[in-house]
């Protein structure tokens, strides 16, 4: 009976509970402490290990939604029913208390200790480093969540400015999961990100303009640009008889002189206009409201929301995944 009670309280395996009760000479409280210390020892020993697997869950209670990730080392542990149940219990506690930080969650009571203790105990049971991560929350008049394919790997949570149709809310959650926007609209994209995109676009446009000029000059000289686009190609194409050594010398001279001349005389206004166009394309891809709807590609997300309710918009969203993208 004590073994069953100890298993229920700690989640430890039958043999661990039996050994703890034997070691404590039947003292139940001491047995609980033994299991807890074992968990702490395992956790400390594996503190430098990488936790690339885990379980991610999200839940909404009307005006508040949250997500949490309980991370571990292997897929085998992540899929274990007890591990998933612990993740769900932690999320339920966070939801019930409308937590705003991960430290708040760790301090909440669970079992005979706190959630932080429960995580350490789970580490002792599985023998793997276990940690809490990925906590995010949103709040508003209406919230929705999406657990991607119920595989506990990717979740999204969304808050709307007013109560909205459940189907629309679900579609927006799926949109965020699929298209991974970084902001609701352009105003939410940091200026540093925009400037970096402009800088990259300018350099890319300059390089393209220089390349066009070089290719035009090579063609005018009777040389196929594809035959001289690298040292390796020049050597192999000479061996094949497609170009001569004189062609190579001429091509190298053209590439050097034309590239330098074009780079020194690039039309700045044109370059900036092209770069701005590329920034616009980037913002369309990364801003949620600007994106094409995955459910109706002829419309943007903003248009889908407006069609449902002229005043409806997204107030906040969060996305978390265990997988590299």
Predicted regions and their residues:
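N-terminal assembly/interaction segments in proteins that build large macromolecular machines
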Residues: 1-325
